[in-house]
Amino acid sequence: MQKQTLLNIGFGNFVVSSRVITIVNPSSSPMRRLREDARQEGRLVDATQGRKTRSIIVTDSNHVILSAIQAETIGHRYTSEEVEND
């Protein structure tokens, strides 16, 4: 059985890293539409703790997760975990 690693997305919130499809910046219009569509369909998880959204994470289950941590920071955490697991 493969060990599942958790990706810290800030404020005590974690995502299983193998389920992450993409980590993107929320400032573009398509990302705003993605967020609104997910909210309307009940697929949105807000992990910002009331702070400004700085990254959007999309999972293989088509859930959209909002994080207050920069996309670059989460990306570095994601890649460093992958290197550790190899």
From Swiss-Prot:
Cystine bridges: which residues? Answer: none
**Recorded superkingdom:** Bacteria
> Which Pfam family would be a valid example here?
RemA-like
Q: What does the similarity note say?
A: Belongs to the RemA family.
What's the protein here called? Putative regulatory protein Desal_2819
Q: Which organism is it from?
A: Maridesulfovibrio salexigens (strain ATCC 14822 / DSM 2638 / NCIMB 8403 / VKM B-1763) (Desulfovibrio salexigens)
